[in-house]
Amino acid sequence: MSSKLRVGVAGPVGSGKTALVETLCIALKKRYKIAVVTNDIYTKEDANFLIKKKILEEGRIVGVETGGCPHTAIREDCSLNKNAVMDLENKYDPLDFIFVESGGDNLAASFSPELVDLSIYVIDVSAGDKIPRKGGPGITRSDLLLINKIDLADMVGANLNIMQNDTNMMRDGKPWFFTNLSSGSGVDNVIKYLVAQIPNI
């Protein structure tokens, strides 16, 4: 028993990871069968938030308390997350998507290939237009990069043209999109990308 696509969602604290998972679940759930695993160090805050929003039936959202570094729980020792994913796949077989949301981490975050099939890394404009050129596995190696909160660019003095040029250079042809998850801008691009990755649909 397995899901057709396990999708990892990582990024710094406050970049929009949970908002992305919420938005994708709402957009996809009428057509696809979905489950979610969230990660927090000492709580199940993100899972509880999504459950309260009723984006999916409660049993399809599981929170994992990692008790330590968010990066370790998705890379070096992903057993807690792997078990949560397998439990959901057994309970709700067949599934089209399982989203695994990492706890907030730095630019070095990356998922174990044993845990997910592809990864989305989310950064946001409010951190400054220098972020893409700082690189790191999240920027350069993720399957899809999202630069979120583009509506804040003027307020924080970030130049989107600079971010675009730097991202194109750092990504070397890999896909990425500007998004504003609050308004829904760019979400259609993300959905099209994900649906295209699912085999046999």
UniProtKB/Swiss-Prot annotation:
Provide the Gene Ontology terms for cellular component: cytoplasm
Q: Does the keyword Nucleotide-binding apply?
A: yes
Q: Which cell locations does it reside in?
A: Cytoplasm
Gene Ontology biological-process entries? urea catabolic process
Kindly indicate whether the keyword Cytoplasm belongs to this entry: yes
The record's InterPro entries line, in alphabetical order, gives:
CobW/HypB/UreG_nucleotide-bd, P-loop_NTPase, UreG
Binding residues for GTP, per the UniProt record? 11-18
Predominant location: cytoplasm
Q: Family assignment?
A: Belongs to the SIMIBI class G3E GTPase family. UreG subfamily.
The subunit structure is: Homodimer. UreD, UreF and UreG form a complex that acts as a GTP-hydrolysis-dependent molecular chaperone, activating the urease apoprotein by helping to assemble the nickel containing metallocenter of UreC. The UreE protein probably delivers the nickel.
What's this protein's name? Urease accessory protein UreG
Instruction: Tell me the organism.
Output: Prochlorococcus marinus subsp. pastoris (strain CCMP1986 / NIES-2087 / MED4)
Q: What phylogenetic lineage does the species belong to? A: Bacteria, Bacillati, Cyanobacteriota, Cyanophyceae, Synechococcales
